[in-house]
């Protein structure tokens, strides 16, 4: 006998988005979301794209995100390849003819996204999911899977509790919950990269590279060993990281 209709492993944006939308479109279904962290947790992946705006609106959480005080992101600037000139990309540069040809209509114009502190952003999404009726279990660590033939029927939690569901969604991100237990995880050797990052305060705002405190851009710069990111996440704080190969380190 199932304990619920859907078990979601992982309380990041993927898990909260899925859980929220399932409850919206099937309010009678019981959805249990398992998040291993007992409270808000640090994470990278701080520069968002405008393509998620329609999703946030469908979830009913757009106003909460837009009103949270995150710096608005208007685009991206790059220094990439042999030509070291700055390549500017603005979200509001819309090619009307191209959009008409591709979609047959002009979709909603979205001019910005946000640069976010993930502990705050993810917490807003998690609390919103809970407010829609999703059963959120914090500090719930899934340590194994329950199998019914070839079917994954549920999870085993730390402490031995078994939880069964009609469906199981692995939204654990890099943790790769299901792929580890099913031993089906494979790495692309060309993408075996690592990232080192830190946060800096007091860095000058450079409009050419990032913008100004309420209207920013991510700045991406290629270097011989990989590439750097420069993401303004607050009025006086930037996230700076280097992505490079394992061999370089």
Please describe what each predicted stretch is:
Residues 123, 127-249:
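Predominantly flavin-linked oxidoreductase catalytic cores and closely associated redox partners
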Residues 7-9, 20-44:
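Glycine-rich FAD pyrophosphate-binding loop
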Residues 41-87:
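N-terminal FAD cofactor-binding segment of flavoenzymes
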Residues 85-109, 209:
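Charged, glycine/proline-rich intrinsically disordered loops and linkers
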Residues 44, 58, 67-68, 117, ...:
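N-terminal Rossmann-like dinucleotide/flavin-binding domain of flavoprotein oxidoreductases
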Residues 98-128, 249:
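Short beta-strand to alpha-helix junction loop
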Residues 15-16:
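N-terminal Rossmann-fold NAD(P) dinucleotide-binding loop
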Residues 2-6:
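Extreme N-terminal starter segment of soluble prokaryotic enzymes
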């Amino acid at each position: 006998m199932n304990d619920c209709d859907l078990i979601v492993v992982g309380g990041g944006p993927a898990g909260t988005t899925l859980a929220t939308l399932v409850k919206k479109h099937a309010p009678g279904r019981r959805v249990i979301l398992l998040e291993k962290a007992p409270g808000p947790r640090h994470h990278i992946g701080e520069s968002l794209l405008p393509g998620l705006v329609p999703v946030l609106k469908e979830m009913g959480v757009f106003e909460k995100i837009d009103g949270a005080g995150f710096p608005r992101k208007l685009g991206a600037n790059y220094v990439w390849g042999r030509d070291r000139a700055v390549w500017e990309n603005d979200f509001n540069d819309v090619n009307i003819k191209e959009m008409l040809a591709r979609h047959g209509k002009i979709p909603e114009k979205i001019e910005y996204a946000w640069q976010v502190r993930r502990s705050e952003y993810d917490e807003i999404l998690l609390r919103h999911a809970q407010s829609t009726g999703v059963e959120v279990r914090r500090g719930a660590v899934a340590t194994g899977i329950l199998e019914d033939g070839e079917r994954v029927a549920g999870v085993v939690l730390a402490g031995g509790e078994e939880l069964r569901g009609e469906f199981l969604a692995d939204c654990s991100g890099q943790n790769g919950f299901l792929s580890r237990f099913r031993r089906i995880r494979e790495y692309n050797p060309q993408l075996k990269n690592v990232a080192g990052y830190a946060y800096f305060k007091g860095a000058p705002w450079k409009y050419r590279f990032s913008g100004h405190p309420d209207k920013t851009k991510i700045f991406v710069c290629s270097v011989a060993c990989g590439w750097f990111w420069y993401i303004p996440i607050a009025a006086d704080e930037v996230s700076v990281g280097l992505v490079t190969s394992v061999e370089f380190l």
